Amino acid sequence: MLVEFYYFQVLMNMSEKTEAGSGYMNSMCVELELGGMLNMSSVRRIEGTVFGRDELRITQVDGFNLDLPPGEHMLLFNNYDEPGVLRRVVEQLAAANVNIAHFSLGRKEKGQMAMSAVVLDSAVPAEVLANLAGSKAINNLVAVSVFCFFRVVVISLCPALF
């Protein structure tokens, strides 16, 4: 199976709004519209909030509830909710000496598709991304690197397209 990786950056300005149904006093939703970029036609929706003064939390990705502090290096992917899938991901990260700082899993129904979000201490090597993307149990794998420059957030995405 041929797996290709495309790197691109999304520059965005953030705005804050409180939604009645979010369950949080203050929350922010960022929608990354990827339509037209590399023939992709999708929107990724990430919601978050702040606890206390400065404890940021990602609370939802694409409709899946999560609890995850954002980090500089992250992996987002959908996986089938079945035994052994996450073990295979963790083993491949460990073999590449990539440490997991935080991990959150959200699912809507038992045995259906779930969303995994992982904060890492370093970027994932391309060969590990290729191995993970080649798994039939993993879909929509995206490696994310987030950098902030003078109130502008630069998000570098590496979606595995196959």
Predicted regions and their residues:
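A conserved regulatory-domain signal marking ACT and ACT-like small-molecule sensing domains
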Residues: 1-149, 162
